[in-house]
């Protein structure tokens, strides 16, 4: 389900397929994000939103699911940046 979609400038692997894993396996997002951190990976945020929209979710609902998980795992600063960029 998970696959690489590239690398960040600081060498972390960008992972896609997270929404599908979250939906099909029922794993909490913060658990998934913690696992990615331990593997020097980061979510493909745009792909997460695209998968969720493809499943019929509206952007506000998607962001409300991401908000606490990003804040708990990566901190409020990164949460603010990610959510701002996803809102466009």
Residue locations for each model-derived region?
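A glycine- and charged-residue-rich anion-binding loop/surface
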Residues: 1-88
């Amino acid at each position: 389900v998970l696959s690489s979609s590239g690398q960040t400038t600081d060498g972390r692997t960008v992972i896609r397929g997270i929404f599908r894993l979250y939906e099909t396996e029922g794993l909490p997002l913060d658990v998934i994000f913690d696992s990615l951190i331990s593997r020097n990976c980061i979510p493909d945020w745009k792909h997460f939103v695209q998968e969720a929209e493809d499943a019929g979710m509206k952007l506000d609902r998607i962001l409300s699911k991401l908000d606490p998980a990003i804040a708990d795992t990566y901190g409020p600063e990164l949460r603010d940046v990610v959510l701002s960029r996803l809102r466009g």
